Structures are given as structure tokens and as C-alpha cells.
Amino acid sequence: NLQHKVSAAFSEYRAAQKEPGTTSVGQRLELWNKSIELFKTAPIIGHGTGSAKTLLTRDIPKRTGSPANAIGNPHNQTLLFAIQWGLLGVLALYAMWSVHLLTFRGEGIIAWIGLVAVVQNILSSLFNSHLSDFYQGWLYVLAVGIAAGTITKTAYPQGVSAVLSLNRS
């Protein structure tokens, strides 16, 4: 249950304070700290697409002697974007989420489905990089796209282009 998971996470956090990287929470904290340091070295435009894995794993064999522990993902969507695309990427991510949230501010079941998809993605992105994972990324795209398309079709039954051409006349 949730209480057990939260309690276990705090226990792992305390263990990680004593010996970093030995628990799942400890590894995440280590990855987050390293991600912040990487962001500081290229804060505006980042290190480039696909650079996170290389940058996050380049010191692993030196420290542990084994590349098996290499994790090339900070398990945080904001940090992943910050490493790869800097502040510009983070602003683009937050702008996307903001537009999606505004899209689903209306009433009705479709708006609620879209809103739940966006909020779930934002919250889960604190502890993972779902937009970059194949299944979760496509699920988000499909859920938001279908819900937004349905809302648009309901609002403009004759089509958006027809409404735009009528407004020009």
C-alpha cells in the first residue's frame, strides 16, 4: 500500500545519507545531483539530444569498476530536458504542459480524461522520464491528442478551418 511505499522510501533515503548509491532512492539522489551539476555546465542550451546517457554514465566504470550499474537516465523529466536542452528545453516542456492543462480546463468527461493524463504525466515525471520512454510517451501523446481532438471537434463541429475562413470574411 501507499503508506508502506512511502515508509520504505524514507528508510532508503536515510540509508542513502550514510552510504550514497546503495539503495534505489540513493541512486536517484546521486543521479539528480549529477544532473544538476551537468545542467550548470551548459545551462542555456544544454549538451544536446541524446547526451544524458553518455554524460551520466561516463564516470561509472571508474567509480565502481563495473559498467553494470550504469543508469543513463536521471529518472526526472525536468532534469533530463535540462541536461539535453538546458533552460530552453525545460521552458518548452513546461510550456507544453501548460498548454495541455489549459486545453482541458472545461467541463465534461473528455476534459477530465485529458486533465488526468496531463496531471499524471507531470506528477510521475518527478520520479521518471516517461515522455522519453516508448510506451509511456506514446500513451501520453495518444491520450492528450485524442482528448484534445475530441474537444476541438465538439467545439467546432464544422471544423476549425471552416470557422477560421468564416472569421476572415
Where are the regions a protein language model picked out?
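Transmembrane alpha-helices of multi-pass inner-membrane enzymes
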Residues: 96, 114-122, 126, 130-166
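Long extracytoplasmic/lumenal interhelical loops at the membrane interface
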Residues: 19-33, 41, 45-85
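A membrane-periplasm/extracellular boundary helix in multi-pass inner-membrane enzymes
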Residues: 1-19, 33-41, 49
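Hydrophobic residues in alpha-helical segments
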Residues: 39, 82, 105-108, 126
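Generic recognition of well-ordered alpha-helical segments
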Residues: 12, 31-34, 55, 77, ...
